[in-house]
């Protein structure tokens, strides 16, 4: 959540490259924290609520601010994005073990942050991408639970590669890496990231 708050500050200071980098670091850190809490079996109602608040702050509010709020259309889209992230967290209970219903907010945020870095904050492209992410978050499809740090070794290598790229390579290269990673999760959820078929909702 702290990184999300820093991202918000950078966005208001019009330093979108720093704001985007904070979100990419948060994307990786979120996976590490979830793996750690699962491993040591830390789970409580308060902890779950704090986690949801952190996810909303970082991957909802901070991500939406990448769109800018100095224009009417971008401001409205930012509000819709925050609302979609909030709705997703509050009401999208999958009902199927080890799955997410709708695209998880961290992946949508990662795509927005990566796009911002690759396009140097191009508002039109960011707004188009944000519109797509809203649709994916509100989608009724199921995505596999991404236990990357508790899964096959090659997935752990993907994660380690992301950390190395983010801290030791040019931002454009690390942004491209994270973008491809997140897009692969959207378009090949089961083939690459899940062990069971990506389920469709039953009517």
Swiss-Prot record:
This protein's name: Transmembrane protein 269
Main location: membrane
Annotated membrane topology: Multi-pass membrane protein
Annotated TM spans: 60-80, 124-144, 157-177
Domain of life per record: Eukaryota
This protein's encoding gene: TMEM269
CC annotations in GO: membrane
Keyword set, alphabetical order: Membrane, Transmembrane, Transmembrane helix
Subcellular location: Membrane
